[in-house]
């Protein structure tokens, strides 16, 4: 597992690690993970669901999406669509 995934997913507040950052919404229970300025993963820790947006097509973005997918899947989270995660 890459360091940015373990560092950001464990953070209780907004955080930046290199080109990656975590933004926690103060009003809803969503945590957005960004690569550069693109949200590639959204987590809802309350429902234990996550959504990946890997539609960008670049190799590095797809690799980072795969890291989040692996982390959350192994952690017992359910992968849902972007529409479902935003409906919370």
From Swiss-Prot:
It comes from the Viruses. This is Putative gene 42 protein. It comes from Bacillus phage SP01 (Bacteriophage SP01).
